[in-house]
């Protein structure tokens, strides 16, 4: 059978439909391609924004860390300025603020302990002295724990306990003695040229050498064994302190007190008077001079 004849109008209509179909397919393809490009653009933009955000965040963190470090340095320097003038009430708040940022900084903890000892010296009430002393001791222990290779940090507990001794009950005095020796030994193992450590060791030996056998026996029965000290070793310890740092009056006065305990009165007067003639340069110098005068009065 022959196909039915197609009129010119029908033929034109079919041609238009084919064009429309072909055009629609092309348009759909173009739209699909456009959508793919848009999607890729969005992904790239999101990735770029994320990276920019990450870089900006890191930069801000670095700025914050740098600012914090700078802030701590500024606080400590301001604190040192007050400390040089023995103004503990002004130095302490600055150091405590710095501690919030660096709670494990041994040098800072040593400085804080020192300010509490300064306040302890200024306090008129023994109860208040002990309260401040225990705070200083806590910071001293923390300094020692955070600075195992720091001489000043290891020595801090010994200095604080020595400052507290006159106000402690007898039982605690006995318990403190081996702790002081342990602290000094650790400090000297780190720095054998620490005049502070030799001074404290000399005082430790002098005080314990003064305890009679009878008192030592009774103390051992009631409070526990008391370490033994040597007055001869005390003399050598203090001479080492002077040789290392001859500019501190406390070394001379303490050596004079050692000689007084040994019965060597002329040498006692010589060294105590030498210390008394030197200018006050440290917070405890007036207190040290007073002890020297009391010793002279008994000679």
Task: Tell where the protein language model's regions lie, with residue ranges.
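Bacterial N-terminal signal peptides that target proteins for export
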Residues: 43-54
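N-terminal leader/linker segments that initiate helical-solenoid repeat arrays
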Residues: 66-102, 106-121
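Bacterial N-terminal signal peptides
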Residues: 53-64
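Short coil/linker segments at helix-helix boundaries
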Residues: 82-90, 114-149, 156-193, 203-241, ...
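C-terminal/domain-terminus segments
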Residues: 249-287
């Amino acid at each position: 059978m022959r196909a039915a004849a197609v009129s010119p109008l029908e033929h034109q209509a079919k041609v238009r439909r084919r064009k429309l179909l072909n055009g629609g397919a092309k348009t759909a393809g173009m739209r699909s391609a456009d959508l793919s490009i848009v999607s890729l653009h969005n992904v790239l933009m999101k990735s770029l924004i994320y990276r920019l955000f990450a870089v900006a965040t890191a930069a801000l963190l670095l700025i914050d860390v740098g600012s914090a470090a700078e802030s701590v340095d500024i606080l400590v320097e301001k604190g040192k300025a007050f400390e040089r003038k023995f103004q503990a009430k002004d130095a302490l708040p600055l150091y405590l603020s710095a501690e919030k940022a660096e709670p494990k900084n041994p040098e800072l903890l040593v400085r804080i302990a020192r300010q509490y000892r300064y306040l302890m010296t200024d306090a008129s009430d023994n109860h208040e002295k002990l309260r401040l002393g225990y705070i200083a001791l806590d910071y001293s222990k923390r300094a020692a724990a955070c600075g195992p290779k720091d001489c000043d940090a290891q020595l801090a507990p010994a200095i604080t306990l020595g400052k507290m001794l006159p106000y402690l009950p007898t039982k605690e005095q006995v318990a403190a003695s081996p702790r002081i020796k342990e602290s000094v030994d650790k400090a000297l193992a780190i720095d054998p040229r620490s005049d502070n450590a030799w001074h404290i060791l000399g005082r430790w030996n002098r005080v314990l050498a003064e305890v009679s056998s009878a008192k030592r026996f009774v103390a051992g029965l009631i409070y526990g064994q008391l370490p033994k000290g040597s007055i001869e070793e005390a003399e050598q310890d203090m001479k080492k302190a002077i040789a290392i740092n001859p500019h501190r009056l406390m070394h001379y006065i303490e050596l004079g007190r050692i000689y007084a305990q040994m019965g060597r009165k002329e040498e006692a007067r010589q060294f105590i008077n030498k210390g008394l003639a030197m200018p006050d340069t440290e917070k405890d110098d007036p207190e040290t001079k007073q002890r020297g005068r009391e010793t002279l009065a008994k000679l």
